[in-house]
Amino acid sequence: MREIVHLQTGQCGNQIGAAFWQTISGEHGLDGSGVYNGTSDLQLERMNVYFNEASGNKYVPRAVLVDLEPGTMDAVRAGPFGELFRPDNFVFGQSGAGNNWAKGHYTEGAELVDNVVDVVRREAEGCDCLQGFQITHSLGGGTGAGMGTLLISKIREEFPDRMMATFSVVPSPKVSDTVVEPYNATLSVHQLVEHSDETFCIDNEALYDICMRTLKLSNPSYGDLNHLVSAVMSGVTTCLRFPGQLNSDLRKLAVNMVPFPRLHFFMVGFAPLTSRGAYSFRAVSVPELTQQMFDPKNMMAASDFRNGRYLTCSAIFRGKVSMKEVEDQMRNIQSKNQSYFVEWIPNNIQTALCSIPPRGLKMSSTFIGNSTSIQELFKRVGDQFTAMFRRKAFLHWYTGEGMDEMEFTEAESNMNDLVSEYQQYQDASISEGEEEYAEEEIMEGEE
């Protein structure tokens, strides 16, 4: 079976990771200590993508938990699913990275990274046929961003032909944790552009908006935000965990979603949105799900796709859904919103179906979009970066750990390049230099 090894780094990564494991354990019928008491063979069929079967009907996540300070991990260990994880797979330092990317990437993190790679290697050796890795982390801090990207490049070196997917929490303007977030995020994006195969961008601001606007929570906690993220992660990985036809592994997902190697940053969405306590008591239909899923308010990254165009997107429906109805809805969305899709990639919406819905819902859908409007997110971080870097504010924290200003300049220009690449494909039309094709295109459009 095609296994995936999961890594979670830093405080944010560990909290999201813990929520993810809690969600998928429930879906696969495992209790807090990994014992199976589910009802359906489908739960077991591809269990070993994410879980290792130990003795006594117990399943253990293929997860490696990493942090530069013990606090968050103690919390995970004390949580409801703390018994689930293999104790040897907790790798932590004592000093912390203090929100400093350089500490995570070059000094503190670099000391710990070999221990982590050893654990990862051991997990990989326990797999029949490893398909790749996924990592949860934030880009604004020290450990998840600095050490997380260091781990990604180390794993890349050792497993060059395996897929690398990241669930990356991007700093947002409204919900700022530290003042140096723009530095940490830009340095991280610089790494992700080169070393990751697919990055699912999650944005705290967008999550807050969803909690306040849609779920009507007056002051959402990180627990509420993580609940949303785990719903999306569960949806994105559905095709990997249950038998299905489309996007059944990380590589197929990437082949369908990434038209150019550097442009692998995805927006994600989920429908129906429910808050943690209250599951929706009304039935949802496929048209409603489709409508909600393509609604900008449902996107978990604070960029509005109406300001750009979709290169590709993928929709995953779960529950008892009719294939035909889904196809019709998708065609409908695409023909109504033609201007939001690039015309030079025909059939750029992929759909997948899985008959097992998430807990507490009859049906749900998850959306993954590769839209040029994600550049807004990088622009925003880039502008904040430039404002501080021009004055060399806070730089001494980084140079003190042995970093060079040159690296900042490179990261900045790499991110600017990324933004202009997105812009270039947003503006590209089918007719450039291909006049004879343009006429055919018009004919088809008139039918």
UniProtKB/Swiss-Prot annotation:
Subunit relationships: Dimer of alpha and beta chains. A typical microtubule is a hollow water-filled tube with an outer diameter of 25 nm and an inner diameter of 15 nM. Alpha-beta heterodimers associate head-to-tail to form protofilaments running lengthwise along the microtubule wall with the beta-tubulin subunit facing the microtubule plus end conferring a structural polarity. Microtubules usually have 13 protofilaments but different protofilament numbers can be found in some organisms and specialized cells.
Location(s) in or outside the cell: Cytoplasm, Cytoskeleton
Binding site for Mg(2+): E69
Gene3D superfamilies (alphabetical): Helix hairpin bin, Tubulin/FtsZ, C-terminal domain, Tubulin/FtsZ, GTPase domain
An example Gene Ontology CC term for this record: cytoplasmic microtubule
Record protein name field: Tubulin beta-1 chain
Gene Ontology terms: biological process: microtubule cytoskeleton organization; microtubule depolymerization; microtubule-based process; mitotic cell cycle; mitotic sister chromatid segregation; mitotic spindle disassembly; nuclear migration along microtubule; response to antibiotic
Other remarks on this protein: E.nidulans has two beta-tubulin genes: benA and tubC; benA is expressed during vegetative growth.
Subcellular location, principal: cytoplasm
Keywords, ordered alphabetically: Antibiotic resistance, Cytoplasm, Cytoskeleton, GTP-binding, Magnesium, Metal-binding, Microtubule, Nucleotide-binding
Cited InterPro entries: Beta-tubulin_BS, Beta_tubulin, Tub_FtsZ_C, Tubulin, Tubulin/FtsZ-like_C, Tubulin/FtsZ_2-layer-sand-dom, Tubulin/FtsZ_GTPase_sf, Tubulin_C
Protein family according to the UniProt entry: Belongs to the tubulin family.
This protein's record includes keyword ATP-binding: no
Binding sites annotated in the UniProt record for GTP: Q11, E69, S138, G142, T143, G144, N204, N226
Needed cofactors: Mg(2+)
GO MF annotation: an example: metal ion binding
Database matches in CDD domains: beta_tubulin
Gene assigned in the entry: benA
Primary role: Tubulin is the major constituent of microtubules, a cylinder consisting of laterally associated linear protofilaments composed of alpha- and beta-tubulin heterodimers. Microtubules grow by the addition of GTP-tubulin dimers to the microtubule end, where a stabilizing cap forms. Below the cap, tubulin dimers are in GDP-bound state, owing to GTPase activity of alpha-tubulin.
